[in-house]
Amino acid sequence: MQRPDMSVAVAGIKMRNPVMTASGTFGYGAEFADYLDLECIGAMISKGLSLKPKAGNPTPRIVETPGGMLNAIGLQNVGIDAFIEQKLPYLKNVNTPVIVNLYGNTLEEYGEVAARLDGLSGVAGIEVNISCPNVKQGGIVFGTDPGAAQEVVRLVKKNTTKPMIVKLSPNVTDVVLMAKACADAGADALSLINTLTGMAIDLERRRPVLANVTGGLSGPAIKPVALRMVWQVAKAVKLPLIGIGGIMNGRDALEFMLAGATAVQVGTASFLDPSAAQRIAREMEQYLVDHKIESVSSLIGALEL
């Protein structure tokens, strides 16, 4: 058979294959150019960008755990203006869609960052991180309150013409409720899941390992949770989904597609193997060849119950 068709599209963003890089694990893209061919992956997602530069949390802020890692980086980034001036020019010369992940500490910040990206060439879409505390509302996380999440999504939608992916938090009682709220507010696609909140303790020192005390758990340990949430949301919402959580190889990625994801994001795997995203895309294609499957899109939601 001829080579299988690996192309997919998420909210109008056409990709050569379903493998995207997860925000916060791939720098701004250029940092990984020596380790893999940036034009062999589906899309690149930037570090989370805020209105102003952010220094992040004190160290230590990363710790390995059984089956994964905890991070409390604190959304360190150069700020939206520096990204546009210093990082985006390089990315414009790469023939791979660039999606900008953005966040805010207030509703207004989300809207302002989205507005600054609107109309820019070289940005195929935006991913909205709603797992941030609303400093004007006592620190409640936008992504754990359906009403607050809808406010963010509506404002970003108002301020941009670019496709909008909303990244869902798993730290909720009902992820389907959050997914429906974001869909109703105008999300064009959903990515899930973000990290699970966890902590690590140093027994000898009787202190938390992370300076921030808690952090976000990622890696293979969260994959079963992520698969379950993707499957649940796929049954409830008619939007393209991007699966995230513990994807280390091509088989992992294809499992997410069976559960209902159109594409996947590779995150923690890139810390262990900087070329992971390209390798996973290659492994997915080889699986299709071995099983005589003509198109990867035929696997989306093809789970048999």
Swiss-Prot record:
* Gene3D superfamilies linked to this entry: Aldolase class I
What is one cellular component GO term in this UniProt entry?
cytoplasm
User: Oxidoreductase: is it a keyword of this entry?
Assistant: yes
Reactions it catalyzes? (S)-dihydroorotate + NAD(+) = orotate + NADH + H(+)
Which GO terms fall under biological process for this protein?
'de novo' pyrimidine nucleobase biosynthetic process; 'de novo' UMP biosynthetic process
Q: Name one Pfam family in it.
A: DHO_dh
Positions binding FMN in this chain are 23, 47-48, 101, 129, 167, 193, 219, 245-246, 267-268
What EC number(s) are associated with this protein in UniProt?
1.3.1.14
Q: Where is the active site?
A: 132
Q: Which SUPFAM superfamilies match?
A: FMN-linked oxidoreductases (SSF51395)
Where does the signal peptide begin and end? none
| Subunit structure and binding partners | Heterotetramer of 2 PyrK and 2 PyrD type B subunits.
Q: Which PANTHER family match?
A: DIHYDROOROTATE DEHYDROGENASE (FUMARATE), DIHYDROOROTATE DEHYDROGENASE (QUINONE), MITOCHONDRIAL-RELATED
Please identify the protein, giving its name as recorded: Dihydroorotate dehydrogenase B (NAD(+)), catalytic subunit
- Give the originating organism: Citrifermentans bemidjiense (strain ATCC BAA-1014 / DSM 16622 / JCM 12645 / Bem)
Please state the gene responsible for encoding this protein: pyrD
